[in-house]
Amino acid sequence: MNLHEYQAKELLASYGLPVQGGILAHNGEEAAAAYDKLGGKFAVVKAQVHAGGRGKAGGVKVVKSREKAKEVAESLIGTNLVTYQTDANGQPVNSVLVCEDMYPVQTELYLGAVVDRSTRRVTFMASTEGGVEIEKVAAETPEKIFKVTVDPLVGLQPCQAREVAFQLGLKDKQINEFAKLMTGAYKAFVENDFALFEVNPLAVRENGALACVDGKIGIDSNALYRLPKIAELRDKSQENERELKASEFDLNYVALEGNIGCMVNGAGLAMATMDIIKLKGGQPANFLDVGGGATKDRVVEAFKLILEDKSVKGVLINIFGGIVRCDMIAEAIVAAVKEINVNVPVVVRLEGNNAELGAKILNESGLKLTSADGLNDAAEKIVAAVNA
């Protein structure tokens, strides 16, 4: 689950991080009032969406009057912002954050943290190349990124934070200020189950003080059950409608841009299924894992989700019977196809527990379901059916 910039800044401020002041506005009048309240020579109006690249997409504007603040806010709110991180439809802008005047600054830095799967620990990344995409820095000048891995038994040590401060070129009081900031960020990361933390840029102001000009936070969705206050911050308008509906039925669904719908049990098998579809010249329309406890209702909902995507021209169902029996899945597929008007080719591959019985149920159903003998055969049949 992602947080908006204003939510991220509020959370980080509660842990003692110095953040750029800002006021949330839901319309032009509120933006104009926010400009007056901030009282600077200029302000920055930022569209609040769950996507990076807002500046290049026109979602971040500098304004020098209350009238301009109102004009920019009205031009953004109610529209969809398309960036390099969104699909062609973009993300809806429901509000803007009017931020205080902080520029010019001495320099812009970068500070971020993720859970490093290779070390299974929180790893901080810092760079003197703030204000630009960290992926670009990693690709072009990786030597300018400093990494610190935190031992979960002892937490982030002050000496580690000071070492990063030295590498960033900070001096005197800035070193202790940065150490406090980084320690607060680690505490926030652990206590709120962050999956991602990023401040870009972390500005060094003309007076030498540090300030988080932007804030990006991603929460581990698996931990939301123990984070009720964080869960309340979820903005469902920023999520794909089908993905949102899938989560209500405990279906793992990710929309893609192909034309072959996939229904699979198991994340690994789902990824392998998408790979072999690509290998055979097809394009998967989605990732959909119905899980080990697939039932008729879940299969029906999975079918509905897949077919709501009008670009889907065929469906490949790939089930490995382990925990779940193939005959039960076959019965659910038959019931789902009868309940829903499925007018695209459907190829079914069943393997494992009661696979033969499952295939018999499908063959005797009288429905236009194509059985496949193995994953390779299934991929070839669905690609051929879609291209026919």
Curated annotation (Swiss-Prot):
Keywords: ATP-binding, Ligase, Magnesium, Metal-binding, Nucleotide-binding, Tricarboxylic acid cycle. Binds 1 Mg(2+) ion per subunit. The keyword Nucleotide-binding applies. PROSITE patterns: ATP_GRASP, SUCCINYL_COA_LIG_3. GO terms for cellular component: cytosol; succinate-CoA ligase complex. One of its GO terms (biological process) is tricarboxylic acid cycle. Signal peptide: none annotated. Its EC number is 6.2.1.5. Heterotetramer of two alpha and two beta subunits. Residues 9-245 form the ATP-grasp domain. ATP binds at K46, G53, R54, G55, E100, Y103, E108. Pathway: Carbohydrate metabolism; tricarboxylic acid cycle; succinate from succinyl-CoA (ligase route): step 1/1. It catalyses: succinate + ATP + CoA = succinyl-CoA + ADP + phosphate; GTP + succinate + CoA = succinyl-CoA + GDP + phosphate. Succinyl-CoA synthetase functions in the citric acid cycle (TCA), coupling the hydrolysis of succinyl-CoA to the synthesis of either ATP or GTP and thus represents the only step of substrate-level phosphorylation in the TCA. The beta subunit provides nucleotide specificity of the enzyme and binds the substrate succinate, while the binding sites for coenzyme A and phosphate are found in the alpha subunit. This is Succinate--CoA ligase [ADP-forming] subunit beta. GO terms for molecular function: ATP binding; magnesium ion binding; succinate-CoA ligase (ADP-forming) activity; succinate-CoA ligase (GDP-forming) activity. Belongs to the succinate/malate CoA ligase beta subunit family. Mg(2+) binds at N200, D214. It comes from Neisseria gonorrhoeae (strain NCCP11945).
